[in-house]
Amino acid sequence: MELSSLTAVSPVDGRYGDKVSALRGIFSEYGLLKFRVQVEVRWLQKLAAHAAIKEVPAFAADAIGYLDAIVASFSEEDAARIKTIERTTNHDVKAVEYFLKEKVAEIPELHAVSEFIHFACTSEDINNLSHALMLKTARDEVILPYWRQLIDGIKDLAVQYRDIPLLSRTHGQPATPSTIGKEMANVAYRMERQYRQLNQVEILGKINGAVGNYNAHIAAYPEVDWHQFSEEFVTSLGIQWNPYTTQIEPHDYIAELFDCVARFNTILIDFDRDVWGYIALNHFKQKTIAGEIGSSTMPHKVNPIDFENSEGNLGLSNAVLQHLASKLPVSRWQRDLTDSTVLRNLGVGIGYALIAYQSTLKGVSKLEVNRDHLLDELDHNWEVLAEPIQTVMRRYGIEKPYEKLKELTRGKRVDAEGMKQFIDGLALPEEEKARLKAMTPANYIGRAITMVDELK
């Protein structure tokens, strides 16, 4: 079978392939090879720019332009050529080195220094920087923009429904009212914290040889300050430098990055489930789309499929991300190869998350508050005013306020008239009685509206 969306084993590349297209140029085999080529070329250019490395003279402008073009115009055909070479070498990074030697063979100035391609490097020098560039690109260009869309979409709901009262539920039972907007603001605030934290994760890299001590570098050029050279090179790629490593960059930052993504995903699962529940309670209605079918046998169904799809894919995403976060920082002695196959799945966890983000955004776009139902539900739960009444009774020293309200309301339905009669019988100042009698389940919402307005 030819590989296609119909024959792909993973639904990430199959059924949902169109939803993860933004990740293909980053996390695919092509993407990894593209970043490896970039690192190898920039390393050669860095060597040529150092006066003490006389065997690699400073490149002429044409040679620099030629090397830059190899990086900028790296194509699928180039990637395919590397894979062809790899069939002989059985070593993926060495195949990149040989590919570059082929590319520079026609330029005498570059051909003369071709043995300095991959100079003093271990494969992991190239790989760790390539993975760092992959993750930085994905974070900055894909993940954070999607997070911003989600946060802004939920903030829009908060503002739109800032004053729509909602009967809260704790333990699934009626509780002190809030507003739809305030509940959305709670989620947006949590997400904003994770957004800031993800943006602040230091993406690290190293280029220091087989065990992190520049052994081969110093053997060849003892007069060069390779530690400084390494720092300059890594930071020139837009990556933070890690000066202390074994053969591998220890991947702690990947754990930090993915733990943060998993936390955001968990917050989104919480949101998906809450909205699913609000739809089930008829608090939200869903806009219907012509032609869509909710059930193969029940024609009336309008299911919350977007939030269900999101929840399921977020679970898969977190399973992958959390495994990566716990596995990658552990490597035997100066390195073992267990991280290699795991690192090839960086895009899988992000891919499932991306599918989920788009599903939630679609679901949010179809939500409409069922205002009449919300008000009706509040009107059938006057017992929630037991809280403010007993609290005011405490202020004025009335004996056993909690117990009296418990006797009136626990396990019972109390209407507006019953509450007013109870208030009239209390030894309270008349202005306090009037204030309490003006309260309804729909307006007993505390600072909910103000807190939405204060959300940044």
Swiss-Prot record:
InterPro entries, per database record: Fumarase/histidase_N, Fumarate_lyase_CS, Fumarate_lyase_fam, Fumarate_lyase_N, L-Aspartase-like, Pur_lyase, PurB_bact, PurB_C
GO process terms (BP): 'de novo' AMP biosynthetic process; 'de novo' IMP biosynthetic process; DNA damage response
Reaction equations catalysed: N(6)-(1,2-dicarboxyethyl)-AMP = fumarate + AMP; (2S)-2-[5-amino-1-(5-phospho-beta-D-ribosyl)imidazole-4-carboxamido]succinate = 5-amino-1-(5-phospho-beta-D-ribosyl)imidazole-4-carboxamide + fumarate; (2S)-2-amino-2'-deoxyadenylo-succinate = dZMP + fumarate
GO molecular function: (S)-2-(5-amino-1-(5-phospho-D-ribosyl)imidazole-4-carboxamido) succinate lyase (fumarate-forming) activity; guanosine tetraphosphate binding; N6-(1,2-dicarboxyethyl)AMP AMP-lyase (fumarate-forming) activity
Induction (free text): Its expression is under the control of the transcriptional repressor PurR.
Record keywords, A-Z: Acetylation, Lyase, Purine biosynthesis
Provenance organism: Escherichia coli (strain K12)
GO annotation, cellular component aspect: cytosol
PROSITE patterns assigned: FUMARATE_LYASES (PS00163)
Active-site residues, Swiss-Prot/TrEMBL: H171, S295
Similarity section: Belongs to the lyase 1 family. Adenylosuccinate lyase subfamily.
Residues annotated for N(6)-(1,2-dicarboxyethyl)-AMP binding in this entry: 15-16, 90-92, 122-123, 247, 296, 301-303, 309, 335, 340-344
Name used for this protein in its record: Adenylosuccinate lyase
The protein's Enzyme Commission number: 4.3.2.2
Binding site for fumarate: H91, T122, S123, Q247, S296, K301, V302, N303
Pathway connected to this protein: Purine metabolism; AMP biosynthesis via de novo pathway; AMP from IMP: step 2/2; Purine metabolism; IMP biosynthesis via de novo pathway; 5-amino-1-(5-phospho-D-ribosyl)imidazole-4-carboxamide from 5-amino-1-(5-phospho-D-ribosyl)imidazole-4-carboxylate: step 2/2; Purine metabolism
Subunit structure comment from the entry: Homotetramer. Residues from neighboring subunits contribute catalytic and substrate-binding residues to each active site.
Role noted for this protein: Catalyzes two reactions in de novo purine nucleotide biosynthesis. Catalyzes the breakdown of 5-aminoimidazole- (N-succinylocarboxamide) ribotide (SAICAR or 2-[5-amino-1-(5-phospho-beta-D-ribosyl)imidazole-4-carboxamido]succinate) to 5-aminoimidazole-4-carboxamide ribotide (AICAR or 5-amino-1-(5-phospho-beta-D-ribosyl)imidazole-4-carboxamide) and fumarate, and of adenylosuccinate (ADS or N(6)-(1,2-dicarboxyethyl)-AMP) to adenosine monophosphate (AMP) and fumarate.
